[in-house]
């Protein structure tokens, strides 16, 4: 088994009415927690790397860690660049062995988005990789992605068919109300995704895989844990899991999850160090953090995404 593209994963997911989890990775423990969960659930998985994670962990280390996870689990694992902002970055990741890249030109005018996406598609396809593109702009902050609420915009369903046909992209991220980071909705408001947009997009692109970014649910037990042990995250709210389940039953084949993993790791480490103030062995607190990431991912795979047993 080697690193695979998402093409077969998405075809099966679309036909089966479930979604694949795309989890952001930064280090060994996060990769291990995710892939151990996927192995126990016999689930396909996408490990995705932001440009910030690539800088932090070193591009060679990350690729080799993912290759090790493939060997260790025997699972189909897709290695994906999240939010590539240039042709040069996408090309570098394809050259490094990524099987999938995202070119995010969603903030550019439509014609510029088409042109840049097409350029990335031509290079990636020539080298055996697939491409995710984006129409519509999500608000929020996550790594190098910083978009103010007033600069965000829903995807226009009337644009999607032309965009996909002209670019040749393999999947499309759309904006239907999710956002990046841990503060997705204002306290006191009812979170609600625009399923009407999703349904119209899927009607215009039958059988085509749709992607949801910014889909962490922000588990309140970890928010409370962080706040209890020295942190400050008032008003952190995520996407309700029942709405993600609904999206997975429709045309959404890839659901991106990052903040939930960060919360699980940070909350666990804060709690452990507060309860063991004399401890200084990183294995003692990184081990429990890895285990809680594993349990969180198992929950997502089984109870939200529905991709258990689909590897």
Each model region followed by its residue ranges:
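Basic/polar N-terminal segments that are highly enriched at the extreme N-terminus
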Residues: 1-4, 311
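Alpha/beta enzyme core
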Residues: 4-12, 27-52, 59-76, 84-209, ...
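Terminal accessory/targeting
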Residues: 5, 14-22
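Conserved residues at beta->alpha junctions
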Residues: 24-25, 214
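An acidic- and aromatic-residue-enriched active-site/binding cleft used to recognize and process polar
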Residues: 136, 215, 260
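Long, repeat-rich segments with strong aromatic
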Residues: 212-218
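C-terminal alpha-helical cap/extension of soluble enzyme domains
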Residues: 227-231, 239-311
